[in-house]
């Protein structure tokens, strides 16, 4: 079973770049574009790791 990583970033290009690299290395990746989406994803299933944009806007 692969480790699951949640990428939280409002920049689609960054999410796609990081996601592609991680998937190529065998990780399962979920994405969220904002704070609210991130909370929904976390409530569905807690990821093993989260990569978070430190300047993420709430919303």
Predicted segments, located by residue:
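Non-catalytic signal-transmission and effector/linker regions of two-component phosphorelay proteins
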Residues: 1-6
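Conserved acidic carboxylate
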Residues: 9
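Two-component/phosphorelay signaling modules centered on CheY-like receiver
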Residues: 12-30
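Residue-level marker of structural boundaries
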Residues: 23, 47-48, 59
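Acidic, metal-coordinating helix/loop segments flanking the phosphotransfer/catalytic sites
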Residues: 31-49
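Redox-cofactor binding/interface segments in oxidoreductases and associated redox assembly factors
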Residues: 52
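The short loop immediately C-terminal to the conserved phospho-acceptor aspartate in CheY-like receiver
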Residues: 55-57
